[in-house]
């Protein structure tokens, strides 16, 4: 399964700079509003150190990591849902994304213009974007409702949906995003691609000092709790882009940082969406596959090919750490570390798998 993340934020918060760094891209990231006109898309590999280890173990010809697609749209402004600025035009480009990353400026720099030339105010900025997403969803629902009301005259199920959509409208009008509701019927609204129904990860763009400022991070985390937060320095991420792996690691360590912004964002997205990965390995290739936590072995097999799920017989599974400790698949089997699991087996994050199937 592929994972896609839409990046939103006000103009000049470092959104496009961060996107460039995450995707190793070189799109325009200018110091003025609406540097991003057309939506930009970048597909990036999910960092996973296990893949190279397995590739060395199996002498694999190639490595295929799991991937994430990032979509960067024009900066939103107050009134975007009514056509102000350029952002509203491109909101549809993130409607089918699995999650939203909201980039929030949390650094001072007089050389970089703020969208309204006011002092830095993360809470105000967050409220502006959230309001625009709510208003965009209201427009979607209010456009859909009249059509559904006509259907409801002859269809009892449609009447239930009318009542449900009206309840969503009532909550949105109170400023409550759909994701904050406890009893969301995602199946009923799946065709609407509502923005506030998507999980949101807040990426606070801080300066280098902010990466280790626990007081600042606590204050910012409290603003958006219980949503996931990550703290990135877009400027630093841009510097990392052209460095070798070792040089990048040294630069990160010099700032007391262990992970790149990309790794932080992807880990937060996996956690927020309840995702994990399993591995397949052989001489031809080593590969990571993204699945939902709690999926059974047949469901996981279906990600490779629908025939694998339909004709599932069993899964040969070894824990990654046990495999590495053994030094080879043959040794792992001799040590009794490779086991056979059936249709009810729930996949675990460190599983290295070979599926057996028959169609």
What residue spans do the PLM features occupy?
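Conserved Switch II/interswitch segment of TRAFAC-class P-loop GTPases
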Residues: 42-47, 74-84, 95-157, 171-184, ...
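Conserved G1/Walker A P-loop phosphate-binding module
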Residues: 1-84, 88-114, 123
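Amphipathic alpha-helical transducer elements in NTP-driven molecular machines
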Residues: 34, 48-51, 64-70, 84-98, ...
